[in-house]
Each structure stands twice: as C-alpha cells, then as structure tokens.
Amino acid sequence: ACALSISKRTLYELFCDKEQLLLEVFVMHQQEMITYISEVASKAQNALEVIFAFYKRKLSELTELNPLFLRDLRKYPNVLSYIRERQKQNDAAALVHYQKGVEEGIFRDDINFDIINQAISMQFEMFVYSDITENYPLSEIYSEVTFLHMRGITTPKGMQMVDAFLQSVKEKR
C-alpha cells in the first residue's frame, strides 16, 4: 500500500480481504498473459517461437518473485483453487501449440503432451514448496526444468532451434 501511495483503509474499501485482492491480481495477470500469448501466436512463424516468448516472460517474472510469496499463497485457498483451474486451462491451450509443433516437425509425434503438461505443472508446484528454492533462484530452476523438457520433446529440427535460442540467451547475458 505504501509503495502505491494508497492507504490500507482505501485498499480494504475496495477489497474485503487480502485473499480477494490477491485473487484480483491473479485474474488480471492471467488476462494480460492470455493477451500477450495471443499476440505472439498471431505473429509467430512456428510453435517454438510462442514457447520461447512465454519462457522469456515467465523467466522475467520469476526473477522478480520472492519464493516466500508462493509459499504464502497456501494461506489463501480460493487463490490456489483459481491458480490450479487456470493451470488446467493453460495446459489445454498449450496442447494446441504442441500439436502445431508436431505438424511443423519441431516436436516429436510419439509423446502424450497431456501427460507431459500435467507432469511439468506438478514438478513446478513441488519445487515451489521444497527446499531447493533456498539454494537456487526460481528463475534458474524454471530455466533448467524448461530446457530439460524441451530437449526431451523436440525433433532434431526443433533441437537446433532450441540450441540457437539458448545461444542467443547466453550472448545477451
């Protein structure tokens, strides 16, 4: 409230409690992400470009995020419920991009992407609540898991694109 020059009283006039405030923030963030991905997808030449754009955006967010914030979300069951429901919808949307990537010869055609999506979601949730975040930043964990995943699902053509993307990321550091 102080950083925004808003009194707590004003906040509680607009929101009945912290959970409602958090929920509204997550709803707004989700809407922004949907708009962003839609814009990227409409201009992308292939499915990997969409995934790379999502990766960059998520990495930027995680760089700024304190892992304790995610752990504190356990205190707000409605927020967690919303996040889990949105994750299911996001996974369904991701399946469209994976299928497009299969058709483009970028992703392997012998993978059940529904299982992979659910496994990745569970893996990230497990990391958030584990001690690994005490030793490594969320952004590094996200990056390592994402590219381990990408290497497992891409064809040789897709792998060349992944390697080129990773090289460009290293050069920018």
List each language-model region with its residue ranges.
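Short amphipathic alpha-helical segment with a characteristic S/N-K-E followed by hydrophobic residues
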Residues: 17-22, 32
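Short hydrophobic/aromatic patch on the recognition helix
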Residues: 5-15
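All-alpha amphipathic helical-bundle segments outside canonical DNA-binding/catalytic cores
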Residues: 49, 85-86, 103-119, 136-143
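The alpha-helix within a helix-turn-helix
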Residues: 1-2
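Short secondary-structure transition hinges
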Residues: 60-107, 115
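C-terminal peripheral helix-coil segments that are non-catalytic and often amphipathic
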Residues: 96-100, 104, 136-173
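Hydrophobic alpha-helical connector segments
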Residues: 24, 35-64, 117-120
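A short secondary-structure junction motif
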Residues: 32, 58-65, 97, 101, ...
